[in-house]
Swiss-Prot record:
GO terms for cellular component: m-AAA complex; mitochondrial inner membrane; mitochondrion. It is linked to Spinocerebellar ataxia 28: Spinocerebellar ataxia is a clinically and genetically heterogeneous group of cerebellar disorders. Patients show progressive incoordination of gait and often poor coordination of hands, speech and eye movements, due to degeneration of the cerebellum with variable involvement of the brainstem and spinal cord. SCA28 is an autosomal dominant cerebellar ataxia (ADCA) with a slow progressive course and no evidence of sensory involvement or cognitive impairment. The chain crosses the membrane at residues 143-163, 251-271. The keyword tRNA processing does not apply. The modification N6-succinyllysine is found at K117. Residues 39-142, 272-797 are mitochondrial matrix. Residues 1-38 form a transit peptide. In the N-terminal section; belongs to the AAA ATPase family. In the C-terminal section; belongs to the peptidase M41 family. It comes from the Eukaryota. This is Mitochondrial inner membrane m-AAA protease component AFG3L2. Changing L621V: In SCA28; uncertain significance.
């Protein structure tokens, strides 16, 4: 009985059939039949259960397949509205809400039913769906691990191929003479039908331990040559060397795939880190797929600049503080029915603090601050600009209330209808989208827009109208009080000499730097620190600041530039002519220092202290022209010739003459009219006046310059001795200050102001007015309260 069961066991899946054969009459003895019947019933029951289980699996798979909607008809079964599975138990319909996530996970994982996303919209988490939407489903960490493991794999492959024992190559003749004829060959292995590896008889391996191999042209030729050779050597029967054919991987397949892998890796890296996606984290994968996304940065508590670090533009600062106060305390304005202005545009010359004021706004506002440059909207692809504008304002609405700052908005906000030559301009499309987003049907709420530009004259009028930019804030160069306040800000971190007081030093430096912008003031303070460090000084003294001012005004001092004695003498008399002419002209600027040491592009240098004023008379402009012509006149008087050194002087005189006649209406023949002079770099296609008027203007300019030149000749001819004394002392000392001029020429015959107190006399106070209106005195109070509140109360509010 046992051996029969064992035979049946060996038949595998034929147990039932074998038992049936044994149960027929005569198959087994009568005593064995009851046991076999019991075994038969057990086996058939198990087989039937196995068949039922297989049938159940097939039916379940079929139901899962049929539960999915046909391809292309997914939209007709949104969100599982095609009903539940028929095979789903009723208890699932009555499950509590807490068990729904698990049921959803099971249905989506198994692909059944219409309750999951498979019955409707495609799962957004699927990697291919994310890839099509421009979002690679691997973050930077996964990418780094992927490249690391790939590099390790290919490095291991290369290491294996380099260190793999390559054996020793021999020729057919060496194989015959040294191995086959001596009977040390056990067998020959034909590898990949390319070469033959020789396997030696045990105990007869070469001393170096390397196997030997030789190349073959073709397998048929090798077999014929081997058979012929063995016959010649008398090797017959079982003594003949067996030939084995094997296939091995020598790494050539992997090496052939390496270029493909490198190309794929490069494409993935390019897609993820394309030109439009560099530095963009968390918003798509960058590159070509996200070229329409905005490149704006959202700043939250990342700026260290505060309003206390901004000086010299108090009026503009108050305007911006009001925006911040509205976002922090809107009830103060809403109770009166006021609406927050949509935006403000900051205009003014370069370096006056427009971007710095925006940074201070970002540092003080307790709301998100979004910054973007106007040039970032325009790319080489058509339609990118409007798409980025839409994405930018969508980002702003998402973070509302917030402040949006567009720097250099003139790059995208230029007037429409210029320079397109009949073609559609991408810049115009971007501007149109910007206008719609700022004040159209899709207006923003609680989003304040700030913008900065140096050229408000070229902006489109539709961009500047109320409702888009309600306020235009002009930030001009600071006056003497503003410069003193700016100096106080930039003197804080500097290590000054113990004899210097910051307030007095700031006022003195402000009086020495008329016309300086905030950026120039910051540059002066930094240059003074660099000069002190260059001389290994322990602190910064007043002399360092004076040298820094000269460095900013005149440029780098070139002590190593060698001038010929004749050239040096010409430069000395040229600068002496400027100094003496200005000394004896009432409306000329007071002289501070004159030098014949080359600075910047010039061979000489004169520093004046111009009076800060906003209105100029005709006599004042004429005196300035005469002082500027003093160098050329001095050359002609003392040398009887003129040089090219007066080129810059003549340019300034010509500009002043044209401005008086064309812009200011200071000529009787041309009349009381004003035309705009073209800016440097502007394209002038036609003049706004006739040819006859242009000829008249040119004639009057020439007459005005000639009159100024004759007046200067008469003045310096009268003061010829003074010019010579100043020139000789310049040749001796190279640098003269105001005290030297007083010693040579006596006190200046006209009253002049030189100290800070004299300049601010009659203006009300010595310092800039930094007081706040009543409504803005507690503008930062809400933020301080939030800081004092414990975390639990803050969350509760």
């Amino acid at each position: 009985m046992a051996h029969r069961c064992l035979r049946l066991w060996g038949r595998g899946g034929c147990w039932p059939r074998g038992l049936q054969q044994l149960l027929v009459p005569g198959g087994v003895g009568p005593g064995e039949q009851p046991c076999l019947r019991t075994l038969y019933r057990f086996v058939t029951t198990q087989a039937r259960a196995s068949r039922n289980s297989l049938l159940t699996d097939i039916i379940a798979a079929y139901q899962r397949f049929c539960s999915r909607p046909p391809k292309g008809f997914e939209k007709y079964f949104p969100n599982g509205k095609n009903g539940k599975k028929a095979s789903e138990p009723k208890e699932v319909m009555g499950e509590k809400k807490e068990s729904k996530p698990a049921a959803t996970t099971r249905s989506s994982g198994g692909g059944g039913g219409g309750g999951g996303k498979r019955g409707g919209k495609k799962d957004d988490s699927h990697w291919w769906s994310r890839f099509q939407k421009g979002d690679i489903p691997w973050d930077d960490k996964d990418f780094r691990m992927f490249f690391l493991w790939t590099a390790l794999f290919w490095g291991g492959v290369m290491f294996y191929l380099l260190l793999k024992r390559s054996g020793r190559e021999i020729t057919w003749k060496d194989f015959v003479n040294n191995y086959l004829s001596k009977g040390v060959v056990d067998r020959l292995e034909v590898v990949n039908k390319r070469f033959v590896r020789v396997t030696f008889t045990p105990g007869k391996t070469p001393v170096d331990g390397q196997y030997v191999w030789f190349n073959i042209g073709s397998v048929d030729t090798f077999e014929r040559n081997l058979e012929t050779l063995q016959q010649e050597l008398g090797i017959e029967g079982e003594n003949r060397v067996p030939v084995v054919y094997i296939a091995e991987s020598d790494g050539s397949f992997l090496l052939s795939m390496l270029p493909t892998v490198l190309i794929i890796a490069f494409l993935l890296y390019t897609i993820r880190r394309g030109p439009a996606g560099i530095g963009r984290t968390g918003r798509g994968m960058g590159g070509l797929f996200s070229v329409g996304e905005t490149t704006a940065k959202v700043l939250k508590d990342e700026i260290d600049v505060k309003f206390k670090d901004v000086a010299g533009c108090e009026e503009a600062k108050l305007e911006i503080m009001e925006f911040v106060n509205f976002l922090k305390n809107p009830k103060q304005y809403q109770d009166l029915g006021a609406k927050i202005p949509k935006g403000a545009i900051l205009t003014g010359p370069p370096g006056t603090g427009k971007t710095l004021l925006a940074k201070a706004t970002a540092g003080e506002a307790n709301v998100p601050f979004i910054t973007v440059s106007g040039s970032e909207f325009l790319e080489m692809f058509v339609g990118v600009g409007p798409a980025r504008v839409r994405d930018l304002f969508a980002l702003a609405r998402k973070n509302a209330p917030c402040i949006l700052f567009i720097d250099e908005i003139d790059a995208v906000g230029r007037k429409r209808g210029r320079g397109n030559f009949g073609g559609q301009s991408e810049q115009e499309n971007t501007l149109n989208q910007l206008l719609v987003e700022m004040d159209g049907f899709n207006t923003t709420t609680n989003v304040v827009i700030l913008a900065g530009t140096n050229r408000p004259d070229i902006l489109d009028p539709a961009l500047l109208r109320p409702g888009r930019f309600d306020r235009q804030i002009f930030i001009g160069p600071p006056d003497i009080k503003g410069r003193a306040s700016i100096f106080k800000v930039h003197l804080r971190p500097l290590k000054l000499d113990s004899t210097l007081e910051k307030d007095k030093l700031a006022r003195k430096l402000a009086s020495l730097t008329p016309g300086f912008s905030g950026a120039d003031v910051a540059n002066v303070c930094n240059e003074a620190a660099l000069i002190a460090a260059r001389h290994l000084s322990d602190s910064i003294n007043q002399k360092h600041f004076e040298q820094a001012i000269e460095r900013v005004i005149g440029g780098l001092e070139k002590k190593t530039q060698v001038l010929q004695p004749e050239e040096k003498k010409t430069v000395a008399y040229h600068e002496a002519g400027h100094a003496v002419a200005g000394w004896y002209l009432e409306h000329a600027d007071p002289l501070l220092k004159v030098s014949i040491i080359p600075r910047g592009k010039g061979l000489g240098y004169a520093q004046y202290l111009p009076k800060e004023q906003y209105l100029y008379t005709k006599e004042q402009l004429l005196d300035r022209m005469c002082m500027t012509l003093g160098g050329r006149v001095s050359e002609e008087i003392f040398f009887g010739r003129i040089t090219t050194g007066a080129q810059d002087d003549l340019r300034k005189v010509t500009q002043s003459a044209y401005a008086q006649i064309v812009q200011f209406g200071m000529n009787e023949k041309v009349g009381q009219i004003s035309f705009d002079l073209p800016r440097q770099g502007d394209m002038v296609l036609e003049k706004p006046y006739s040819e006859a008027t242009a000829r008249l203007i040119d004639d009057e300019v020439r007459i005005l310059i000639n009159d100024a030149y004759k007046r200067t000749v008469a003045l310096l001819t009268e003061k010829k001795a003074d010019v010579e004394k100043v020139a000789l002392l310049l040749l001796e000392k190279e640098v003269l200050d105001k005290n030297d001029m007083v010693e040579l020429l006596g006190p200046r015959p006209f009253a002049e102001k030189s100290t800070y107190e004299e300049f601010v006399e009659g203006t009300g106070s010595l310092d800039e007015d930094t007081s706040l209106p009543e409504g803005l005195k507690d503008w930062n109070k809400e933020r301080e309260k939030e800081k004092e509140e414990p975390p639990g109360e803050k969350v509760a509010n």
